[in-house]
């Protein structure tokens, strides 16, 4: 038990422990003994029965009934369909049982229609009426057949009535009569029927359920919204009131957007909205309202009328359209006619392809291409707006390919959803827009696209005009359907006028076209367009045209190949035949703006066989889903999940990554629902902390119990309450529902948030808690886990450091348990804060008679710094003289008063100097600079950073990892045992790495198998990084981008790090052979006596390990017998193990020894794995073991070859041999079924292994005398050729790979150069480079593992592997992802030569603060304006100013140093000498291209130069300046007080309490009289409690708790005793 939560018992709503909650049980008062069960449903039933028996059953009954009713409905479903519910269907049923209306967001094959048909049957069995609305007559017929089939299977009889156009006259009349009389249980019609027959037949009908199967068709008549609401039980009057709320909310939104807010008007609107909402809720309470289920749309539900569902039913219709892509994007540079490339591609790729022709080539070329492909024997048809017959033929399988024009609203681009048929897309040119300079036949979206692209080329005045026009046009068309936009475009083309709003849009469209025509006449603009690398300017038949990429069409068209379905996202392939390089560049750039993870490869570099295999595997799955034959295993892949984050902004942002979400109101909270293929995800914001310590129980909210005679501290929590009127936050009610400060009843209780979360938790299979990635976030996650545990079967923690789509998906894959150590640290932090704060605050109240005062351990020393600085400030006033010299230099002279007319330059130093950039921001440096440069308070900066944060790697289990103690073990074992000390490589030298996190994830997807020339391989996820040398350059490359012919870094000559040695009893203990531990010593003593008291050594030296090696090679274990098929080893056994009795036969020797047999068995002889302790031994022991293995199973014929069936052991030996500098290769003889370990470096073998050989030394000597010794080779010929040598030495290299020792020798003669320096570093490096022979992609289902470590890498299978940005961080480390972001921006926007990647420190739990995309501030504003980047809240000018600060600092940190001509001069004045420094000139701009240099520019000076004084100013001021907020935060960081997450809060508290004020203008901090008195009192009376040193010590102790190095209960006890000693 760690804590008690008041009011959280899921049965009686009383107090309950965290232990009971996490075990999914009610409190001890309800149930004396807990009930434990792995099966969630069984647990619900068992607890319910126990509560009922005890007579304490209350709210638990609701949990039980819900599960029971779901089971009953599932039984009927199984009878009706033959299947059990899918996870998502179970979620939908739970909502229906609880009377909730909702929108279904679900991919193909999720059974939406089947569910709608079934649930209407279920309602009918309960005497309730249902209405199913479908778009067309065929679907009416299909639904009727489906229901009739279900009724027959379930043996259920209901009154089914349907109406469609294919009925005979008499059947129609009968159906209409039954509808008129309400003589039905289930009614099925089309949307058209509802629109035309509502008044006549349906207006007076009330339905318990309406199921709308296709909302797009349903919404074509917007009045269907009102009609459906009336049929559910709403009156026209209450619908009218809801419409008023919608209009009032629009007015309120406009008011809130104004910078000058009319608070009175806002309050008035809020009250009116609240009043109408209360009326609506009252109406729903008094009237029985039915349930509406709306199946997902493919388009957006536009218009305000749809919002009636939000106001009356609590949900908003989302879109089923997904923005997820699982596409291998490729390109091909044409070397022959495009048509021939297409033919070649079709023959390679097979059937099921779409071929898109760029719009500039048009329908004529599409027809020609279709005819040409037919002539080549392909079954292909052209599809256009006028000819759609090909679609039907394609769907039936009568043709294999479709050709169409790549235009956004084209039939082939948008109207096709055939995930089981479409495998790939070929683009016969880059999708593009082409504009003539006079903009003939403009469309609205093309005009917007062109304006967006060229605005940056316009003069400032025109740019401003263009931005306004652009913004107006985008805003006006936001909710206009496509067919209405086409009418506006036609009106412009034909010179017609329209009416009302449409005419207004037409006018703005016309102005935009005229604006473009005007600016495109400007030659300077045309010149800039021609120079731009992302736009193309072409002259065709004497006419100029601009071409820009049509990225929306590419996304839609390629997206036909990758669709969401039940189980994931189908893999697709896209091939672009590049017909214009500049437009292609533009397309790539825009795709990366939209998709952070976008990557495009050359077609010929793709492993086509593997890609097609995976594509076809997905198509098979989809077919099974569509046919209803999918296996239960695949069904289980689609889980319903609830993701909980802290803030609503973050929830909105995450939801937007996956399409247009459906929304539901749950109490005061909004839940967003999206599909991500394998999960139906509901995203909800918790609102941050929901619980805090109570004030009226225990010692300031902490119970002090006894545990084995020691104090045991248990915090008591209750929900946080906040008054909406006065802002007061509290925990305990003085009077229920009333704010204790102002008496208002307008109080929000976080209990409502808990209720909302519990309501949603009931619906889902798993909960993912994504609170912030720090100790505070971990504690919030722990609270959420505890209070939701009884309501959901599975709860996990997810952690992400940047809010991007890949980061979220990765976090979901890598979901983990709560980190209890982090929670413990936060418990200590909060309890310590409460105890100190309450005790000292009460003392302040008594002394100063003011209950608004407070104190804290951290804020007191910080207040002290400000008080002390103010004292220094007031005592340091002096005279200053400011002079401006004739050359413009400003000089300030301290302690000076009087006149000065001339000065002399006494001394000058001028030199060239490199100026390095600063590292990226940490929290403290960001707060300092935001204070210094932008004038932002710490609190404001943190809030802006939070807004920006919210807007915006693994291997298989058999992978061997090297630990820092020498052991080599499988990564699965390392993770399971939490092995912290790993071996990594830093600067190509070995370095110990501490594992900060251990990752174990479930994987069902592709992995890459990288096979190396030395026989080793690594099996990893596509994004797992390896250290690679390619074309003479070293860098991290993800597995998916590694190519055959690359060289991978492999550990080499590190030196062995193990040093263990054992006695026999110690080895028994290490191996866990406890049953023999005591008897072993006794047995040895007995043997000593038998041998005339001769002393027997039980130290296991190299002889013992040699014997172990022999047994590994040619030994076997039979019970207690050790049998060895190598008789020559007998003398060694007699020498090393004198206490055993040896037996012999014709071909073997052996001995019987129960203990030793068990030892060898556990060490790895036989079937078991080689025990990890072996590689922790001293080097000579391991070498002796290898020698024994060679003496048993080795041969020496030109090379040393060890043969064994135990490939697992040879693999480990191979890694070890590389570590001690012996190059080797692994090879499998498939025919013989054995592995070979081949060593060609006989020189090293002789040094390391040979001394321990006993049987085959002579064999080795013979081979060694005649064989060539092959050592390590480096793949550096391309660099080697660039070396320059002194006369007489010729540089000639024939092979790519050169022996390391030869490189070293030759380098001695080479002239100094960067190439020589690089090659020297490779020679000295503790890695070798092994060629990649083959890359395969395989499907893998199972566990994968990884670490987060203090270095960026660890050793896996001998290979250097990379291990798996948040604004609360003290790290300056930049990840590979961050470096890639910088590289893309710097190379594209500034110049490749400026880029210099820097890691800036070792990797930890956090990364430096950085942008997540290569987008600068100007471009970010444009992309938000264009709607390409969507954000959850409007960003202000201050947001962009802070973003710019972060962006420039980060990009500068990844650029080359600036080189300046530096000047430092001593200027002699009549008063004193003054130093002046700065730069005369910038010799190389480097990082200063993006950020200002920290020095001022000054003119060149000469020694002895006399300069006239132009201007003199005299003033008096303090020498010491007051602190700003930034200065204080820098001190906190420097002195180890506070944490990144608390810096801003501490300063804010001092300001709020009135201890400190901030001056206007310069924003300096000044202590108030109150602040000075409070500080003096605290430091006088309680110095030992609040001193800076004690505070710093406590920070370290809390870090130790977080790292599991200190027990949190011991720390609390120490704190408690300390407070008792000084205060109580």
Swiss-Prot record:
Give a yes or no for keyword Metal-binding in this entry: yes
Q: Where is this motif: DEAD box?
A: 213-216
Q: Which reaction does it catalyse?
A: ATP + H2O = ADP + phosphate + H(+)
GO BP? DNA topological change; intein-mediated protein splicing
Q: Which domain of life is it from?
A: Archaea
Q: Where does Zn(2+) 1 bind?
A: 9, 12, 27, 30
Q: How is it modified after translation?
A: This protein undergoes a protein self splicing that involves a post-translational excision of the intervening region (intein) followed by peptide ligation.
- Binding-site residues, ATP: 89, 106-113
Instruction: Specify the Helicase ATP-binding domain's residue ranges.
Output: 93-256
List the EC numbers from the record: 5.6.2.-
Record PANTHER family: REVERSE GYRASE (PTHR43505:SF1)
User: What remark does the entry add?
Assistant: This enzyme is the only unique feature of hyperthermophilic bacteria/archaea known and seems to be essential for adaptation to life at high temperatures. It may play a role in stabilization of DNA at high temperatures.
Q: What is this protein called?
A: Reverse gyrase
| Source organism per UniProt | Pyrococcus horikoshii (strain ATCC 700860 / DSM 12428 / JCM 9974 / NBRC 100139 / OT-3)
């Amino acid at each position: 038990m760690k804590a008690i939560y008041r009011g959280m018992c899921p049965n009686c709503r009383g107090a309950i422990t965290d232990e009971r909650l996490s075990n999914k049980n009610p409190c001890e008062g309800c149930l004396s003994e807990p009930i434990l069960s792995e099966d969630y449903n069984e647990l619900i039933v068992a607890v319910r029965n126990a509560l009922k028996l005890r007579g304490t059953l209350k709210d638990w009954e609701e949990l039980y009934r819900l599960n029971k009713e779901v089971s009953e409905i599932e039984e009927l479903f199984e009878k009706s369909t033959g299947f059990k519910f899918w996870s998502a269907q179970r979620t939908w049923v739970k909502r229906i049982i609880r009377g909730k209306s909702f929108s279904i967001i679900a991919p193909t094959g999720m059974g939406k229609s089947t569910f709608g048909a079934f649930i209407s049957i279920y309602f009918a069995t309960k005497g309730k009426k249902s209405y199913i609305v479908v778009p067309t007559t065929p679907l009416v017929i299909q639904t009727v057949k489906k229901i009739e089939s279900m009724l027959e299977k379930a043996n259920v009889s209901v009154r089914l009535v349907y109406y469609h156009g294919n009925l005979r006259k008499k059947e129609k009349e009968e159906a209409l009569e039954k509808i008129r009389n309400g003589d039905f249980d289930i009614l099925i019609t089309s949307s058209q029927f509802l629109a035309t027959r509502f008044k006549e037949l349906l207006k007076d009908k009330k339905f318990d359920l309406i199921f709308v199967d296709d909302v797009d068709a349903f919404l074509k008549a917007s009045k269907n919204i009102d009609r459906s609401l009336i049929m559910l039980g709403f009156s026209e009057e209450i619908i009218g009131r809801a419409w008023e709320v919608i209009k009032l909310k629009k007015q309120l939104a406009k008011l809130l957007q104004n910078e000058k807010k009319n608070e009175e008007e806002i309050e008035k609107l809020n009250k009116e909205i609240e009043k109408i909402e209360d009326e609506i809720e009252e109406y729903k309470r008094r009237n029985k309202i039915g349930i509406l289920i709306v199946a997902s749309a493919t388009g957006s539900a536009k218009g305000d009328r749809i919002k009636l569902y939000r106001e009356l039913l609590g949900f908003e219709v989302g879109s089923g359209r997904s923005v997820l892509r699982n596409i291998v994007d490729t390109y091909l540079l044409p070397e022959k006619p495009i048509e021939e490339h297409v033919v070649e591609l079709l023959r390679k790729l097979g059937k099921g392809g779409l071929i898109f022709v760029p719009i500039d080539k048009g329908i004529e070329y599409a027809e020609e291409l279709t005819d040409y492909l037919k002539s080549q024997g392909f079954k292909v048809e052209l599809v256009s707006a006028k000819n759609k017959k090909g679609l039907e033929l394609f769907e039936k399988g009568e043709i294999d390919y479709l050709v169409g024009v790549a235009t956004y609203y084209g039939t082939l681009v948008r109207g096709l959803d055939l995930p089981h048929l479409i495998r790939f897309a070929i683009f016969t040119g880059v999708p593009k827009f082409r504009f003539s300079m006079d903009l003939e036949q403009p469309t609205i979206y093309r005009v917007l696209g062109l304006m967006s692209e060229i605005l940056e080329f316009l003069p400032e005045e025109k740019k401003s005009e263009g931005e306004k026009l652009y913004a107006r046009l985008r805003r006006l068309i936001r909710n206009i359907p496509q067919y209405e936009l086409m009418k506006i475009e036609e009106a412009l083309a034909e010179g017609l006028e329209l009416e009302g709003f449409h005419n207004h849009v037409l006018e703005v469209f016309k102005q935009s076209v005229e604006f473009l025509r005007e600016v495109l006449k400007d030659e300077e603009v045309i010149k800039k367009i021609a120079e731009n690398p992302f736009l193309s300017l072409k002259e065709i038949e004497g006419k100029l045209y601009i071409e820009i990429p049509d990225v929306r069409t590419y996304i839609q068209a390629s997206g036909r190949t990758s669709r969401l379905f039940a189980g994931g996202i189908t893999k697709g392939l896209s091939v672009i035949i590049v017909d214009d390089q500049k437009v292609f560049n533009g397309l790539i750039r825009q795709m990366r703006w939209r998709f952070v993870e976008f990557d495009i490869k050359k077609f010929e570099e793709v492993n086509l066989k593997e890609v097609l295999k995976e594509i076809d595997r997905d198509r098979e799955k989809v077919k099974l889903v569509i046919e209803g034959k999918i296996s239960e295993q695949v069904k289980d892949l689609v889980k319903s999940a609830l993701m909980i984050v802290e803030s609503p902004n973050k929830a909105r942002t995450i939801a937007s990554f996956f399409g247009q979400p459906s929304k539901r109101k749950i109490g005061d909270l909004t839940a967003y629902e999206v599909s991500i293929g394998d999960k139906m995800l509901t995203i909800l914001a918790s609102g941050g902390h929901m619980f805090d310590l109570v004030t009226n129980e225990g010692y300031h909210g902490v119970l002090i119990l006894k545990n084995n005679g020691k104090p045991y501290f248990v915090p008591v929590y209750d929900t946080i309450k906040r008054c909406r009127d006065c802002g007061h936050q509290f925990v305990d009610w003085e009077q229920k529902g009333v704010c204790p400060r102002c008496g208002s009843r307008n109080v929000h209780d976080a209990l409502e948030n808990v209720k909302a979360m519990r309501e949603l938790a009931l619906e889902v299979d798993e909960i993912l808690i994504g609170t912030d990635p720090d100790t505070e976030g971990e504690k919030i996650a722990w609270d959420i886990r505890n209070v939701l545990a009884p309501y959901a079967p599975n709860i996990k923690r997810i952690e992400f450091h940047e809010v991007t789509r890949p980061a979220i998906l990765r976090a979901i894959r890598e979901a983990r348990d709560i980190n209890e150590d982090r929670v413990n640290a936060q418990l200590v932090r909060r309890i310590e804060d409460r105890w100190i704060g309450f005790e000292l605050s009460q003392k302040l109240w008594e002394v100063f008679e003011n209950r608004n005062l407070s104190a804290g351990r951290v804020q007191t020393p910080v207040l002290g710094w400000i008080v002390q600085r103010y004292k220094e400030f007031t005592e340091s006033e002096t005279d200053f003289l400011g002079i401006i010299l004739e050359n413009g230099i400003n000089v300030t002279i301290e302690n000076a008063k009087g006149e000065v007319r001339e000065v002399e330059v006494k001394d000058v130093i001028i030199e060239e100097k490199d100026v390095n950039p600063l590292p990226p921001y940490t929290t403290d440096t960001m707060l300092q600079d935001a204070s210094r440069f932008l004038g932002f308070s710490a609190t404001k900066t943190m809030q802006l950073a939070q807004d920006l944060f919210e807007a915006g790697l693994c291997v298989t289990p058999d992978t061997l990892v090297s630990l820092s103690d020498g052991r080599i073990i499988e990564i699965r074992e390392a993770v399971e045992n939490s092995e912290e000390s790993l071996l990594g490589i830093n600067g190509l030298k070995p370095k110990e790495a501490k594992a900060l996190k251990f990752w174990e994830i479930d994987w069902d997807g592709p992995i890459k198998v990288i096979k190396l020339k030395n026989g080793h391989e690594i099996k990893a996820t596509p994004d797992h990084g390896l250290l690679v040398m390619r074309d003479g350059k070293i860098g991290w490359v993800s597995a998916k981008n590694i190519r055959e012919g690359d060289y991978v870094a492999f550990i080499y000559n590190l030196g062995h790090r193990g040093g263990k040695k054992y006695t026999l009893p110690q080895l028994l203990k290490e191996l866990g052979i406890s049953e023999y531990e005591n008897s072993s010593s006794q047995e040895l003593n007995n043997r000593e006596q038998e041998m005339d008291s001769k002393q027997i050594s039980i130290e296991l030296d190299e002889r013992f390990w040699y014997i172990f090696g022999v047994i590994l090679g040619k030994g076997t274990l039979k019970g207690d017998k050790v049998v060895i098929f190598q008789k020559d080893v007998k003398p060694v056994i007699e020498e090393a193990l004198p206490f055993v009795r040896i037996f012999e036969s014709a071909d073997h020797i052996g001995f019987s020894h129960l203990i030793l047999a068990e030892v060898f068995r556990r060490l790895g002889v036989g079937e078991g794995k080689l025990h990890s302790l072996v590689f922790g031994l001293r080097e000579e022991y391991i070498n002796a073991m290898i020698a024994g293995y060679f003496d048993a199973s080795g041969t020496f014929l030109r090379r040393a070859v060890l043969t064994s069936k135990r490939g697992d052991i040879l693999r480990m030996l191979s890694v070890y041999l590389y570590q001690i500098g012996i190059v080797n290769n692994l090879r499998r003889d498939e025919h013989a079924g054995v592995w070979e370990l081949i060593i060609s470096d006989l020189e090293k073998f002789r040094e390391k292994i040979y001394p321990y050989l006993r049987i085959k030394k002579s064999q080795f000597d013979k081979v060694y005398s005649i064989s060539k010794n092959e050592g390590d080779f480096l793949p550096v010929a391309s660099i080697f050729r660039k070396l320059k040598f002194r006369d007489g030495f010729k540089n000639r290299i024939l092979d790519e790979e050169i022996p390391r020792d030869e490189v070293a020798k030759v380098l001695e003669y080479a002239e100094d150069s960067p190439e020589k320096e690089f090659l020297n570093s490779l020679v000295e490096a503790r890695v070798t480079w092994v060629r990649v022979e083959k890359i395969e992609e395989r499907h893998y289902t199972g566990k994968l593992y990884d670490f987060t470590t203090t270095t960026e890498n660890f050793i896996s299978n001998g290979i250097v592997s990379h291990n798996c940005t948040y604004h609360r961080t003290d790290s300056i480390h930049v990840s590979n992802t961050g470096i890639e972001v910088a590289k893309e921006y710097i190379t594209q926007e500034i110049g490749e030569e400026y880029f210099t990647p820097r890691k800036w420190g070792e990797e930890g739990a956090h990364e430096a603060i950085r942008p997540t995309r290569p987008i600068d501030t100007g471009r970010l504003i444009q992309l938000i304006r264009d709607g390409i980047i969507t954000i959850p809240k409007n960003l202000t000018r201050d947001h962009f100013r802070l973003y710019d600060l972060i962006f420039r600092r980060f990009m500068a940190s990844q650029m080359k140093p600036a080189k300046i001509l530096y000047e430092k001069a001593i200027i002699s004045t009549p008063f004193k000498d003054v130093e002046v420094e700065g730069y005369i000139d910038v010799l190389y701009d480097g990082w200063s291209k993006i950020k200002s240099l920290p020095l001022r520019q000054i003119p060149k000076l000469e020694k002895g130069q006399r300069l006239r004084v132009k201007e003199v100013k005299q003033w008096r001021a303090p020498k010491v300046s007051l602190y700003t907020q930034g200065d204080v935060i820098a001190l906190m960081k420097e002195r180890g007080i506070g944490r990144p997450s608390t810096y801003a809060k501490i300063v804010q508290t001092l300001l709020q309490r009135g201890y400190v004020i901030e001056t206007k203008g310069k924003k300096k901090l000044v202590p108030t009289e109150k602040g000075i008195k409070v500080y003096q009192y605290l430091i006088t009376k309680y110095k030992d409690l609040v001193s800076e040193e004690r505070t710093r010590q406590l920070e370290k102790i809390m870090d130790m708790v977080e790292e599991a190095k200190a027990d949190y209960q011991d720390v609390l006890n120490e704190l408690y005793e300390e407070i008792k000693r000084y205060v109580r």
